[in-house]
Amino acid sequence: MNRKRVMAISAVFVSVAFLFFVKVGAGTTSAEQEVRELEQRANAAYEANDLPKYFSFYAPDFTQYLPEGRSDLPAYQKEWSSYIGEGNRVEKVVLSDMHVQIGPSGDTAVASYIIHVRTKLKDGKVTDEENQESDVLFKRNGQWKVVFLHYSAAPKSESH
C-alpha cells in the first residue's frame, strides 16, 4: 500500500472511533440525566403524598433496607399507605449531594444523596430528618425503575 492510502484508511478509522466514543459518552450523560430527573420526580411525588405516582417509580421486584429492616414493594406500599392514611403528611423534601453512577451497559444506575424530609404527624408535631439514600435502578423496556433502596440516618454534622 502506498502512503496516501494508509493515511486515508487511518483517518477513516480515527473518525469512526471518535464518533463511536462521542456516541457512547452522550449515552452515559443522557442516562445520568434521565436518572437525575427520575429521582426529582419520584421525590416530588413523595413530597406531594401522591402515593399512586410515588409507587409507580418502583419495580415490582423492588426491595429495600430501612432502619427497621428489609421489605419488599407490597409491604412498603401497605405500611406507607397506612401511615399517610392515618393523617401523617410529608411537607417538604430537599435533595442534596446527588451522585449518579451509570453502569457500562447504560441500563443500570446507582443514585445516592442526602434527603431532608419535614413531616407533619397526625398529632400536629413536625419532624425534620436528614437521611442518606442510595437507589439502584434498572432500565427495563425503556423505563428506569428503582429496584433497590437503602435508607439510613445521616451522620449529625458538627456545628463549629
Task: Label the model's feature ranges.
Residues 108, 130-157:
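Short beta-strand edge/turn micro-motifs at domain boundaries
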Residues 8, 12-60, 94, 98, ...:
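Short, low-complexity N-terminal intrinsically disordered segments enriched in polar/charged residues
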